[in-house]
């Protein structure tokens, strides 16, 4: 089948590789423009572009997909199907209506739950025990189209975004190939979503990274693993940003202390009071340093019981 593939990050590259391996005719790849990344802010191509170049697939990187010139280019490619995986932009009607087999999307949630740009993050932050991937026919709405296939995965109590991302990238690629085969046979189902059940996974912003110690230990633990490895969560210690990368929830103790108060400091972790129970910090990263386990952190830094995290200023009591 003649396919135009639209996608940008690693999650999308996994699906593109599956199409290539399945022998599908990917006639072009559309991806976001190269952008500066990392501390050096060096311009880097998106993972999808890197893969497309490896297989000598033509790459388009328009700054806008709404201009007539781009739409004409896609039309001239005569795609039977357009596959969209984490592309990062809303497709105009002119593109949606172009391919005879439709525009197909691989979305990293069990629709209609977690529509939007950060479904894996929010599923974990909200403490879900299950998520998955859905393939669907795209329409004008945001993740509102008729569903084709679904595949679910369980979320363990210590699973991070990184772990679930990799599972869903692989499952989504397999589901996409199944979906393409159904399209080729003209027997793909169209299952309407129940819009009344829809929930949303909005784009992550800087304010979402801040740890609120006045939440429960469970909520904070879910927050930390729901932002690992990107973009991370943080608190303030000694007037510096202290990123928290890994936590566990120990047995509950009845302790009278304000949320954010450091209760114990040991090589096994930093025990902090929350609004509901305690949480043990296992891996962290002080501003200007690299991420490390608590044991290594305490070799160079001293954090005392009584310290209140989250406050600008001194080291606490």
Swiss-Prot record:
SUPFAM superfamilies: FMT C-terminal domain-like (SSF50486), Formyltransferase (SSF53328). It comes from Desulforamulus reducens (strain ATCC BAA-1160 / DSM 100696 / MI-1) (Desulfotomaculum reducens). Belongs to the Fmt family. One of its GO terms (cellular component) is cytosol. Its EC number is 2.1.2.9. The gene is fmt. It catalyses: L-methionyl-tRNA(fMet) + (6R)-10-formyltetrahydrofolate = N-formyl-L-methionyl-tRNA(fMet) + (6S)-5,6,7,8-tetrahydrofolate + H(+). Attaches a formyl group to the free amino group of methionyl-tRNA(fMet). The formyl group appears to play a dual role in the initiator identity of N-formylmethionyl-tRNA by promoting its recognition by IF2 and preventing the misappropriation of this tRNA by the elongation apparatus. GO terms for molecular function: methionyl-tRNA formyltransferase activity. Keywords: Protein biosynthesis, Transferase. InterPro entries: Fmt, Formyl_trans_C, Formyl_transf_N, Formyl_transf_N_sf, Formyl_transferase-like_C_sf, GART_AS, Met-tRNA-FMT_C, Met-tRNA-FMT_N. It comes from the Bacteria. This is Methionyl-tRNA formyltransferase. The keyword Transferase applies. Gene3D superfamilies: 3.40.50.12230.
